[in-house]
Amino acid sequence: MRAFVTGGGGFIGLALARRLRERGDAVRTLVRTRTRADALDEIGCELVEGDLSSTQKLAEQMAGCDAAFHVAGVYRVGIPPSVRPAMYEANVTGTTNVLDAATAAGIPRTVAVSTINAFGNTAGRVVDETYRRPEPPEYVSFYDETKHLAHLDAEARAAAGARVVIVQPGQVYGPADHSAIGGLVRQAAAGTLRALTFPDLGLNMVHVDDVASGICLAHDRGGLGESYVLVARSRPSAS
């Protein structure tokens, strides 16, 4: 299989690229610049420079691929209003452009990486893929809003016949995680975590390598139009 991967230089995207290469797949990955793609180059990925702004360009870059994996996105919380347009372009418009490009390029199957954040705050209720966020949605961050909108777009396209499978990872952790959550995990492991801001918070953690395997399974065995939650068996508490 020849796979097209967006966000291959990111935390989840790199793990996915590694997993695909380990099982013998050819990987063409979209990067903003080759100067920061050494890890992808080392594992034998084909690098193409670009971004998510042009559907036509993306379709051209996908030509000849058998599958597409849309992993790219911006993950930040507590951002100033000035950063919101860029996040919207990456997370919402970028998803629209990738899915349109995959259709135009005739990709047999595209896996869109969403998040369990699309469910919103379930107030302790354990839900599955059939759950729908109450309307009107109450967003806890602009990131939350953009990922929910992107998820709805992917669902709508799948319902209209697009060859899309959606995955929804939980809180992902693992090596090279430079997010705020990654920092908290490292502090907790080192015994240096001094404050618990949300002592009643429950997080369903999942290792990045398991997410990469789950994404591959969604492509190989998942039903078109279906969503698959990717989480661990346990639900550890922040307390």
Where do the protein language model's features map onto the residues?
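NAD(P)-dependent short-chain dehydrogenase/reductase
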Residues: 160-166, 170-203
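Active-site Tyr-X1-5-Lys
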Residues: 138-165
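Alpha-helical substrate-binding/gating segment
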Residues: 186-195, 201-235
